[in-house]
């Protein structure tokens, strides 16, 4: 009689699943305000609500907009027919996106921004005529984002 040894396979400990990279990826399923807010840590949620209140006081209309499968749903703020900014969840972080034309860029006190705002300017994309800045809204980024919005609102 021949004995065959069978090695037991070692099972790897189960890894926690990473958070989905796109918060709300399905075009047919827009989130509610409560679902969007539920994904934010408490301090970031407070900054987010302060920013939303500021935009509403400026007369901005707020709605959800689908930015595509790589970004998903996010907030779009408009005043009249002009887009002021977008606020999206990107890789689990709250990010504000604002486009500044040359006149608005001239209104920004770039030296007064924190390192977060300066980094956003360094990583900005677009053209000199229309610069797109992505600013993380956790921490001091929310203050920088508000300063950028004030510059955009001041010129038009």
Residue positions per predicted region:
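Charge-dense, helix-prone N-terminal extensions
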Residues: 2-156
């Amino acid at each position: 009689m021949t004995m065959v040894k069978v090695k037991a396979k070692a099972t790897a400990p189960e890894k926690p699943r990473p958070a989905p990279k796109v918060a709300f990826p399905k075009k047919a399923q827009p989130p509610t305000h409560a679902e969007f807010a539920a994904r934010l840590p408490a301090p970031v949620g407070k900054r987010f609500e302060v920013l939303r209140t500021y935009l509403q006081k400026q007369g901005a209309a707020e709605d959800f907009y689908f930015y595509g499968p790589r970004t998903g749903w996010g907030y779009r703020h408009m005043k009249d027919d002009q887009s002021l900014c977008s606020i999206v969840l990107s890789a689990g972080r709250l990010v504000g996106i604002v486009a500044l034309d040359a006149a608005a860029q001239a209104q920004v006190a770039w030296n007064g921004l924190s390192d977060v705002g300066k980094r956003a300017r360094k990583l900005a994309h677009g053209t000199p005529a229309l610069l797109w800045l992505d600013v993380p809204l956790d921490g001091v980024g929310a203050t920088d984002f508000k300063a950028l919005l004030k510059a955009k609102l001041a010129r038009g």
